[in-house]
Amino acid sequence: GAWPPPALEGMHVHRAGGVIISSMPETSPHIFLQGLVVESLIGVYPQERHAPQPLSIDVAVGLPSTAAFLSDNFQDTVDYAAVADLIRQEAAAQRFQLLERMAHHLCQAIVTRFQAPWVRISIVKPGIVPGAQAVGVSYLFRAPAG
């Protein structure tokens, strides 16, 4: 029949293994990591670029399929440890001036590696602004259609 069905028109939905799931990050199935600490050479100011700085990263990764919820099979989901490893590798290997650019780069890498429909990331950089505990950026990246 027609896709999407009339009852779902205007909603962000897609088919995954015969199950209709939402692709809206607020409601779709995802895995997440909170407080992943990585080291990265990042910053605009010269004093920030002499040594790697600690960053705290929260990331949510949209699942390309809901199969794992029924199968209990590790192969049907996204591996938390693999996501953490990818973030650590990219944070160490790349040099960015802006947290915004780093957020985009990490999201793109995660979407590409894990076929995720979307990634939401927050990167926190402590102790940069006097009087503020930390600064940071949050970013939502959707995989290109197609």
Regions found by a protein language model. Name each.
Residues 16-18:
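Intrinsic disorder/low-complexity segments
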Residues 20-146:
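N-terminal, polar/charged subdomain of small-to-medium soluble alpha/beta proteins
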